[in-house]
């Protein structure tokens, strides 16, 4: 006599167990993104209070339309990144940091994105009132070294701006 019990469930169950084990181990060893460098708490608080609203004024609406146009279409990602980069440079030069940061976060090429975020942080550090935009840009960078450099610049400028006020 033969044993006719259903035993075909063991192999799929073992396979699922092995896959779950591999996923669990990989999750434990996966590199976590490092925390951005520290900036003064008051500056960080101001940066966290930033709300980007390009719809609030006609100029912002115009920039929003340009950004949407540059980021869409049937062109290569490099072309889109290039058009967005031009918008970032123009808006940072015009102190329109809300549009600069909006366009910069849409850039996919890390080196270009970090370089443009650095330019936003540099432009924002020129004026004490716009320093929170520099922190916003610093948090958008992906390179820890670039973040550290931007953090040092912003912290130094914050101290210069608030010397004697504390």
Locations of the language-model features?
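N-terminal Sec-pathway targeting helices
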Residues: 4-18
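Non-catalytic tandem-repeat scaffold regions and their flanking low-complexity/translocation tails
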Residues: 14-166
């Amino acid at each position: 006599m033969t044993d006719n019990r259903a035993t075909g469930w063991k192999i799929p169950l073992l396979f699922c167990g092995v896959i779950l084990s591999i996923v669990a181990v990989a999750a434990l060893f996966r590199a976590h993104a490092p925390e951005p460098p520290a900036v003064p708490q008051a500056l960080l608080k101001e940066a966290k209070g930033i709300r980007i609203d390009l719809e609030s004024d006609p100029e912002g609406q115009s920039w929003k339309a340009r950004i949407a146009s540059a980021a869409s279409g049937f062109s290569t990602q490099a072309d889109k990144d290039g058009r967005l980069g031009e918008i970032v440079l123009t808006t940072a030069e015009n102190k329109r940091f809300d549009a600069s940061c909006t366009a910069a976060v849409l850039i996919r090429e890390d080196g270009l994105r970090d370089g443009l975020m650095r330019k936003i942080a540099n432009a924002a550090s020129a004026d004490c009132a716009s320093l929170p935009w520099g922190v916003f840009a610093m948090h958008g960078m992906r390179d820890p070294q670039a973040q550290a450099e931007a953090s040092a610049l912003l912290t130094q400028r914050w101290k210069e701006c608030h010397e004697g006020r504390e």
